[in-house]
UniProtKB/Swiss-Prot annotation:
Protein name as catalogued: Ras-related protein RabP
CDD domains: Rab
Residues where lipid is bound covalently (S-geranylgeranyl cysteine): C229, C230
Entry annotated with the keyword GTP-binding: yes
UniProt similarity note: Belongs to the small GTPase superfamily. Rab family.
Pfam family, one: Ras
GO terms under cellular component: endomembrane system; plasma membrane
Membrane disposition: Lipid-anchor
Compartments where found: Cell membrane
Biological process annotations from GO: endocytosis; intracellular protein transport
Annotated motif Effector region, positions: 35-40
Molecular function terms, GO-annotated: GTP binding; GTPase activity
Keyword annotations: Cell membrane, GTP-binding, Lipoprotein, Membrane, Nucleotide-binding, Prenylation
Length: 232
């Protein structure tokens, strides 16, 4: 792949309302938390000497009305699943969000996921979801979707973040962007190899057809063609 070509990545954040998805995105883009801009934002950086343009999409509160459209999910390259460490319901809802993504065709073997537990800065006694519970969920999800998949699924990485203390926000985004980037490269190479194989197969088929056509022509016609050519 041309290192000078800009690679576009679409990263979406999903999770229950109020877990801090918008604030996480604003911190990543270094935007004031009071900024009411919704939709998506773009950030550019370099991964392995490749220029990458990352588009991050926010649900903008639509999840409250179960109204996320297919356009929100369309062509996403990576997913950040979010919950709040002080909200058990948001953790339990992760399965529903994962199923929602799969409903739109974004299977774990096609699109990388990471898990983010936000509000980690809260005093420990307010934590109802600990690190082990989150990591166990990640392991279970991998085993659950490994069935019927012909390749090893990547581990789902878990990050504990804080928008107040700026803990692990950049690390989480760099992680999912790198996974999405590497996955996109693999897909591009796979398509290129498939196209090359198809072209080679088509060429072989064309050659075989030409040989078959030649062999099926009666001898006298071959001779006539040769004489016609020679005596033109």
């Amino acid at each position: 792949m041309n290192p000078n070509k800009i690679i576009d990545l679409k990263i979406i954040t999903v999770g229950n309302y109020g877990v801090g998805k918008s604030s996480i995105l604003k911190r990543f883009h270094q935007v004031d938390l009071d900024d009411n801009t919704t939709g998506f934002k773009t950030k550019k950086f370099i991964i392995d000497n490749h220029h990458v343009s990352v588009q991050t999409w926010d649900t903008s509160g639509q999840e409250r009305f179960c109204s996320l459209s297919s356009s929100f999910y369309r062509n996403c390259d990576g997913v950040i699943l979010c919950f709040s460490v002080d909200n058990e319901d948001s953790f339990k809802a992760l399965d529903l969000w994962r199923d929602e993504l799969i409903k739109f065709g974004y299977f774990p073997d096609r699109v990388p996921f990471i898990l983010v537990g936000n509000k980690f800065d809260l005093e420990f006694k307010k934590h109802v979801i600990n690190s082990k519970m989150a990591q166990d969920w990640c392991k279970y999800q991998k085993l659950k979707y490994q069935v019927g998949v012909n390749k090893e699924l990547p581990d789902i990485i878990y990050h504990e973040t804080s928008i107040e203390k700026l803990v692990s926000i950049d690390e989480a985004f760099i992680n999912i962007c790198r996974q999405a980037f590497e996955n996109k490269i693999k897909i591009s190479l796979s398509k290129l190899n498939n196209n090359n194989n198809n072209n080679e197969e088509n060429n072989n088929n064309n050659n075989n057809n030409e040989n078959n056509n030649y062999n099926n022509v009666p001898i006298f016609q071959i001779g006539q063609k040769i004489r016609s050519c020679c005596y033109y």
